[in-house]
Amino acid sequence: MVVAVYPGTFDPLTRGHEDLVRRASSIFDTLVVGVADSRNKKPFFTLEERLDIAHEVLGHYPNVQVMSFKGLLKDFVRSNNARVIVRGLRAVSDFEYEFQMAGMNRYLLPDVETMFMTPSDQYQFISGTIVREIAQLGGDVSKFVFPSVEQWLKEKVAALDPANGASAAQP
């Protein structure tokens, strides 16, 4: 049985993420979606919210497990007996960082492979950062996220600044 881990912050989980999960889950016996704590990134959604979103969107895949992790990816990979780390590459700009991470992971986990997957054409430009910015500015994100995620975004934006629906960090 081949287990793969697809780690990420998933802040929020987008249609691009789901596209990779759908495709990777057809390759591996088990795909573990690892939602990283990533406190140093100061995520828009809490870890618990990101887990809830991932369960909502990915819960129908029978061989996909969603769980959180803190600390080193290598420890999470080992604890799940994974043989592969799945990473998405949207553009050349992603490659340099992902290549360095794959090299470090190979050093730390010599028996684990990193598999890069490119998104389907319609999702190549989607990123959680861009989706959050559009949502915070009142734009339509329905083409980039699932309806439940769009609702989570609207509620979070409204909670941050109920007066105008924009981020509380904006003046």
Curated annotation (Swiss-Prot):
Residue sites binding substrate per the record: T9, K41, L73, R87
Enzyme class: transferase
Main location: cytoplasm
Source organism, top-level taxon: Bacteria
EC number annotated for this UniProt entry: 2.7.7.3
Catalytically driven reaction(s): (R)-4'-phosphopantetheine + ATP + H(+) = 3'-dephospho-CoA + diphosphate
Entry keyword annotation includes Ribosomal protein: no
Pfam families recorded: CTP_transf_like (PF01467)
Residues that coordinate or bind ATP: T9, F10, H17, G88, L89, R90, E98, Y123, Q124, F125, I126, S127, G128, T129
A Gene Ontology molecular function term of the record: pantetheine-phosphate adenylyltransferase activity
Pathway, per record: Cofactor biosynthesis; coenzyme A biosynthesis; CoA from (R)-pantothenate: step 4/5
Function: Reversibly transfers an adenylyl group from ATP to 4'-phosphopantetheine, yielding dephospho-CoA (dPCoA) and pyrophosphate.
Similarity section: Belongs to the bacterial CoaD family.
Listed name of the protein: Phosphopantetheine adenylyltransferase
Provenance organism: Paraburkholderia xenovorans (strain LB400)
